[in-house]
Structures are given as structure tokens and as C-alpha cells.
């Protein structure tokens, strides 16, 4: 019964929740305050948004306008502008020392001197959240990294992502910021690309390097869960962003956009997603009960 009570209080018009509210990214104190927000689902994530991808009705919202670092969720926009540029996906790109992360010192098995096609780099960036792959995509963009980032921000503006800023292509910078409202818009746009749908949801992928075959797995453990029908997804993590997850998934008879930001603990975002799925199945099993746009 609690779920039915929740629905009446959280079902909002998509346009109302998605209105632009310019904010600075919260610090530690503000992030702690976000977690104290009224949340009948008791989600671990500081920020959550669940919307019907077809009717654009918001089924659940928790701090949806808060602006936070988004970590590797950034890579979706990196791939979007790469695909929209119409670049040769079979062009071979060499990993260089410019792709090494000296900021967070993250590790990578893509060694300088290794060669991969742009298609392979897109696959690794989306599925395995490979930072050097995303860096190489930005570096090989026409005009270089700066031009790629500029286009990412232009694309965000064209999608009315008014609380979003991109500083680089991997998500390692805390200056890559957005809100759940904006990220939902990005996911809805990204799902139009068959390559993003396929590559982001592949459970595993292998590439050949000078040292042999490199095997990668999807960073989202829900991909292998038969109870989930995930169409687009991306995970993200840096300390300043917490554990993040965005998905477009079919739950029951509904196509949903799910955004979760700033969860604590490696499994918390997935547990939140499971709780959301149970909530939607309990209170909103059919799109027939909702007006369409």
C-alpha cells in the first residue's frame, strides 16, 4: 500500500521537474544534506529520477535538479558527438601517453602504442568505461580534445541540458557536472543510436593488442540479470561523484529512464535500481494508465 501512496505524491509533469535551475555543484556538506531529503523508497543515492520514456511522466524524483559531478556518465556524450560527427568507425587510432590519467592515476590495459579502431574504442568506453578509450576518442576528434569538449557542451545546450558542463571526455574531472533532469534528456537522445544501445549493453567484449587478447566485462552487473531488459546504460564513479548509474530499461510494460547519482558503496546503485523496479512493478505496471505526449 505504501507504493500506491507514493505514486500520488511523486507523479509530476515531466516539464515541471525538467525545468532549468542553475546551481553550483554541492560540496561535502551539501551532498550530506541531499541524502537527508525525504525519500519514501529509502534509496542510497543522493539523487534519483525515474521517468516514463514514452509519456515523459516522472514516476519518482529525489533532488532531480541538484548539480553533481557525474564521473563516467560523461562518456555517453563523448560517444554521441563522435557518432554525430560521422567519423570513420574503422579508422585505427593509437593510444598515446596523452591518454594516460595523471589526475586520478586510474589504471588501464590499453598501453601507449596500442592500436584500436574507433569502433573498438567506443565499445570499450561505453561497456567497460575505459578511460584511455574515451580520451583517445576525444583526442582524435576533428580539431582535437578541445573541439570535442566544446561540441559536447554545444550538444548539451541543444538538448536543453542547462545544468550540465563537460570539461573533458572521460569523466575523471570533477568539473564534469550535471543533474538527473539533464542526464535523463541525454539518455533519451543516446538511445536513438543503435551502436550505443548495443555496445553499452554487451556483457563482454575482447580486443587484440600487441600482448594478446584483452577481455573486458560490462561494469553494470544488472546486464546479466534476466529480470532486467536494459536498452542503454552507463555506470560512473569517482570519489567526488559517488557511484552513478543511468539506464533506459523496460520494466513491465513501461520503458523507463532511470538516473541514480552519488550512491555510497559499490553495490548501492544496483540495489537502488532493484528497489525502483519493484516500486514501478507494484504501482505502475502498464502505460495504459498514463497519458501520452
Where on the chain are the PLM-derived regions?
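Secondary-structure junction/capping motif
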Residues: 16, 105, 117, 144, ...
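A residue-level detector for conformationally permissive "hinge/kink" positions
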Residues: 5-7, 48, 105, 163, ...
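Active-site-adjacent loops and short helices of periplasmic peptidoglycan-processing enzymes
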Residues: 25-181, 185-194
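Hydrophobic alpha-helical segments and their boundary regions
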Residues: 4, 8-9, 41, 93, ...
Amino acid at each position: 500500500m505504501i507504493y500506491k501512496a507514493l505514486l500520488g505524491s511523486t507523479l509530476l509533469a515531466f516539464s515541471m521537474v525538467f525545468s532549468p535551475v542553475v546551481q553550483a555543484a554541492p560540496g561535502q556538506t551539501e551532498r550530506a544534506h541531499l541524502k537527508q531529503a525525504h525519500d519514501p523508497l529509502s534509496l542510497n543515492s543522493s539523487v534519483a529520477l525515474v521517468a516514463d520514456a514514452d509519456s515523459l511522466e516522472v514516476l519518482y524524483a529525489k533532488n532531480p535538479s541538484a548539480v553533481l559531478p557525474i564521473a563516467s556518465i560523461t562518456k555517453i556524450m563523448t560517444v554521441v558527438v563522435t557518432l554525430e560527427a560521422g567519423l570513420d568507425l574503422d579508422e585505427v587510432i593509437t593510444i598515446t601517453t596523452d591518454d594516460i590519467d595523471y589526475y586520478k592515476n586510474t589504471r588501464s590495459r590499453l598501453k601507449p602504442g596500442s592500436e584500436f579502431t574507433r569502433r573498438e574504442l567506443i565499445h570499450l568506453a561505453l561497456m567497460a568505461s575505459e578511460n584511455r578509450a574515451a580520451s583517445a576518442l576525444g583526442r582524435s576528434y576533428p580539431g582535437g580534445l578541445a573541439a570535442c569538449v566544446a561540441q559536447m557542451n554545444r550538444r548539451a545546450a541543444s538538448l536543453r541540458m542547462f545544468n550540465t558542463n563537460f570539461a573533458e571526455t572521460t569523466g575523471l574531472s570533477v568539473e564534469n557536472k550535471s543533474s538527473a533532469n539533464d542526464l535523463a534528456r541525454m539518455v533519451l537522445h543516446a538511445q536513438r543510436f543503435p551502436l550505443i544501445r548495443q555496445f553499452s549493453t554487451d556483457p563482454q567484449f575482447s580486443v587484440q593488442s600487441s600482448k594478446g587478447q584483452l577481455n573486458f566485462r560490462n561494469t553494470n552487473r544488472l546486464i546479466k540479470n534476466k529480470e532486467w531488459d536494459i536498452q542503454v546504460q552507463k555506470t560512473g564513479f569517482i570519489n567526488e561523484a559517488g557511484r552513478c548509474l543511468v539506464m533506459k530499461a523496460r520494466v513491465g510494460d513501461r520503458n523507463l529512464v532511470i538516473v541514480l547519482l552519488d550512491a555510497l558503496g559499490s553495490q548501492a546503485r544496483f540495489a537502488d535500481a532493484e528497489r525502483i523496479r519493484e516500486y514501478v512493478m507494484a504501482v505502475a505496471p502498464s502505460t495504459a494508465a498514463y497519458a501520452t505526449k
